[in-house]
Amino acid sequence: MDDPKIEKAKKEKRERRFLKIWRHPVKAFLKLRFHYTCKTESVPDGPFLLYVNHVTDLDPVFVACSFDQPLVYVAGENVQRMGKLSSLIRRYASTIDRVKGSTDSIAAMNILRTLRSGRPVCMFPSGNRSFSGKSTDIFPASAKLAIAAKVPLITYRLTGGYFTSPRWSDKMRCGKMHGEIVRVYTPEELAIMQPEELLRQITNDLYEDAYAMEPVAYKGKKLAERLETMLYLCPKCGRIDTLTSKDDTFSCSCGLCVKINEYGRFEGSNVPFEHPGMWDEWQQAKMKALASAAAEAPLLADEGQQLYRLDREHNLMPVTAGRMTLSGKELVIGNSVFPVESIDGIGLTQQDKLSFTSRGENYVIRSDHPRCGKKYYDLFRYLKN
């Protein structure tokens, strides 16, 4: 049997060699393809904790271009279920798995363990990419973790990613993107800070409001396609799930029709909102009001949903299938019922993949047809709060 320490050392050496060979060619490609710029950053010797705002699915690649040592990434456990890509990631990178929609204390312990072994760890403390263009809230536990780690904390901000890879789209655009270190906190500084104070600092360091930046054209094709995975409530007729997209056009069966341009803004004769972020803020207020009624009757529903239980080896075990509903009382999928109070949280991966944790078990919900997962994510968040 191979010695785990020897195998671990071999893997780290392989990661260093891989980074040394590919970092500069990849950096050149990202500059050509996305107009991405960054610089190789000077960082403290030894392990450090790196906090980055989450803007695209390629964030680890963008971030890696700034550092000359391989990072260990905290990632959603779904990266272990991506076929051949997962095999490549396991061979040439190290990850710490975290289950979305859960309060994962195991991930926190693994982060501390990795730092104490001498390796730097990169994580995205918001856990979610922004739908609106404004950075999402940082997990409060992130500040406590940084203080407990007793290593330098580095905050790193990516800008332009929201338009480069809109959360609703599976197509990337070319405009302008940049990454840089915002601040380095020493262990001595962290030791005298209160978690609430540090949380405010981290939030400020990583915050981005994409629509407040100077407008830049982000060129691409089919700019509106899949926007209905983000915007599910029509401001004209007030109905849910009546919005559809095609190419650059976004419309409702009631007659509402707008186009989205290369600046991520709407165009048309009767545009209800300037951009998707404003539309989302409006529908959030409506969803909050819906949640406050806390009706026992279903508030949301979709047919053709499959529920899986996630085992420790990242296998999806079928549980049930059928209609999914969410009320103020419970989440129902097929013949499985989960009281709202038994669910720790609902996570959303990409545009429509839902996951949650209930009574210590992790679950994934898939759909046999395109459907909006964000409406469930939004409503559940307001029900719990």
State the predicted function of each range.
Residues 12-23, 28-198, 220-221, 236-237, ...:
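Soluble catalytic domains of membrane acyltransferases
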Residues 50, 98, 324-354:
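Phosphoinositide-dependent membrane-docking surfaces
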Residues 70, 249, 257, 323, ...:
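Structural motif
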Residues 73, 260, 331-334, 356:
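Short hydrophobic/aromatic-rich beta-strand segments that constitute the beta-sheet cores
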Residues 185, 196-230:
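A conserved mid-domain beta-alpha-beta active-site/ligand-binding segment of alpha/beta enzyme cores
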Residues 219-272:
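Cys/His-rich short segments
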Residues 268-323:
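Anionic N-terminal interaction surfaces
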Residues 342-385:
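Acidic, Ser/Thr- and proline-rich intrinsically disordered linker/docking segments
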